[in-house]
Amino acid sequence: MKRFNLAFLLILFFINTAHPAKVDTLSVYSTSMDKEIKSVIVKPESYKGDKSLPVLYLLHGYSDSYNGWIKKTTSLKELADIHEMFIVCPDGGFDSWYWDSPIDPSYQYETFISEELIKWIDNNYNTIASREGRAVTGLSMGGHGGLYLGFRNQDVFGACGSMSGGVDIRPFPNNWGMKKYIGEQSENPDNWNNYTVMGMLHLLKPGDLSIIIDCGKDDFFYEVNEALHRELLYRNIPHDYIIRPGVHNWDYWANAIKFQLLFFNEFFTSHNQ
């Protein structure tokens, strides 16, 4: 794991306390789901439309919505300004897990985020419209989504991450609405293997994707994150792995997002010179 300099962090986060970044609320039509879906985009103060900026797609957790990150944390505007990037928070449904459901055609959130929303954002803002200018991460259900979408769409995203992510769904067959969209585990074991992050590791090659994983040691998802970390090490897949004291709550995520943005900023800077 890379060690971030605490003094550097303190300098960054006290540089700007005015939060001049702007927030737009968007409504984007999804052809795959035949409905309008809301998102918010945080635009850094420096954005005037004349410079292409990278984009972080930031996913919410189970039972939340597109404005959860904006309402429940206070640092997104400041982080967008410091790192000069767009932050897009799409609505991922109450319990979509960011899949294209093989059972319910009204839940096609992988297609919406990795294709439809990205196309709309690139057409309406001056973005770095390539994998070198895109990253995806999230918390809990969105942590699963960040890695799931990143692993499966490496032509779209160059970096991905997870905070307190449900990175292996198989130990939780009766939780968080998952069986509505991939079927009962006992009847559809292949779906449960194929729609979990742990089932996507064969898609990875060393160095092709920048990956960051963060989980609190007292989180109920800690063990599945540890298992993912061990498997990535076994496969020789480089990744940053952060374990700190903490549980599954907004206090943890409000801190974790700062480390994630540093990681993604380093990726964007090194790939867009």
What is the predicted role of each segment?
Residues 4-15:
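Sec-dependent N-terminal signal peptides
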